[in-house]
Amino acid sequence: MTTPADFASPAVDESSPRYDGWRVTAVCFVVAMFCWGFGLYSHGIYLAELQRLFGWSTSLISGATTAYYLLTASLVVFISDAIVQLGPRRVFLLGTCCLGSAVTLLAFIVAPWQLYLVYLIMAVGSAAMHVGAITNVLGLWFDRRRGLAISLALNGASSGGIFVAPTLIVAIAETGFAAAMVGAATVMAAILVPAITIWIDQPPIRTETTGVSAPQGGSRSGSASTVPRCTRLEALQSLAFWSVAGPFALALMAQVGFFVHQIAFLEPAIGRTQAGLTVALLTAMAIVGRLALGVSLLRLDLRRVTALSLLSQAAALLAMTQTTNAAVLFVACAIFGLSAGNLVSLPALIIQREFEATSFGMLVGLSTAIGQFTYAFGPGLLGVVRDATGGYGAAFALCIMLQLAAAGAVQMSRPQRKPIDLR
């Protein structure tokens, strides 16, 4: 009698450089670079240019940015379902189309309502290319090397701050806002569409459970064993799940708040040019931190790594508030950046290690959504505290308190039993 084992493919060698999953990782790197480049690091550029062109208030434009973050968070919750129903290639192509359309349309808006509409389109694109989508897609190709693949792919997020945003600034100065935005969207489409079409294919057949359901319609590992064993409601009612989602939501609120206010805080002390260089240094160090985590992942206690990362960021922020010395500020930004990228990667890595495998995709999407819902309010909250107190001391003290609380929570709430079954 024929058994399922008769149809199983040979064991997948994820360590081989020829393994197709590494090409998928490269595509995810570029996806992350454009997603974060246009969807996070360039929002300050959009704000400055729209104010220059139309004289719109900061609160009006910031309101559109907050709406963008909140809608993205709402959609990320369901990204694992979208990948199952549509497949990774279609999801990434949909994201590229929406993000590219939004970047292009920003060049032609003339009214505030159009800005909000464009940001809603951008949110759809961002959700389909964000960390939840990338970790779910990589979960289809990787099991043992999933942590390394995620760390490598999400280095693209930091690269968006190093390459995409600065290039956009130069292009706007040379050609104007409209031409630069259309050109940037064209370049993104020219790179991503063929790369996704050629290299994002069906994942390999596996005899083991990877924790991410394969797309429907293909003869892949989409058996009943890969259906999530718990629901989103059960996850939200679980203290074990919140021991991951809660601390990282607080940590990212502080981190994203600092990102948005970094130049405004540093410019009076070291000038605009050097303040801009601290952004490049921070994002470069984020890449170094991710690579270091990726190569040593299997030997590390990830919750302890998270706690130490948050303590180092808190110390860096404290140092920044106590000096105007340029060298000290650069060193503090480098220390802060060393952990910045890992705080995006670590939730998925902890979930993979601690929770039952079949719920990986759903739990990562839900955790990502909670984090984004929370950090959407970070920049505004810091702005309110700064305006109320007349400086950034109290605002950064709030960030430090959030980071210390997150460090304590993630370390003290570690589960006793693994893998965790939430049902």
Model-identified regions with their sequence ranges:
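Extracytoplasmic
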Residues: 23-58, 76-79, 165, 257-263
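Extracytoplasmic gate region of multi-pass secondary transporters
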Residues: 43-47, 236-288
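Intracellular juxtamembrane helix-capping segments at the cytosolic ends
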Residues: 50, 128-142, 342-355
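Helix-to-loop junctions at the C-terminal end of transmembrane segments
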Residues: 75-88, 290-301, 386
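C-terminal ends and interior cores of transmembrane alpha-helices
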Residues: 97-110, 312-324
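Cytoplasmic helix-loop-helix junction between adjacent transmembrane helices
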Residues: 120-155
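Helix-loop-helix hairpin linking two adjacent transmembrane segments in secondary transporters
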Residues: 157-204
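C-terminal transmembrane helical hairpin of 12-TM major facilitator-type secondary transporters
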Residues: 282-286, 292, 299-350
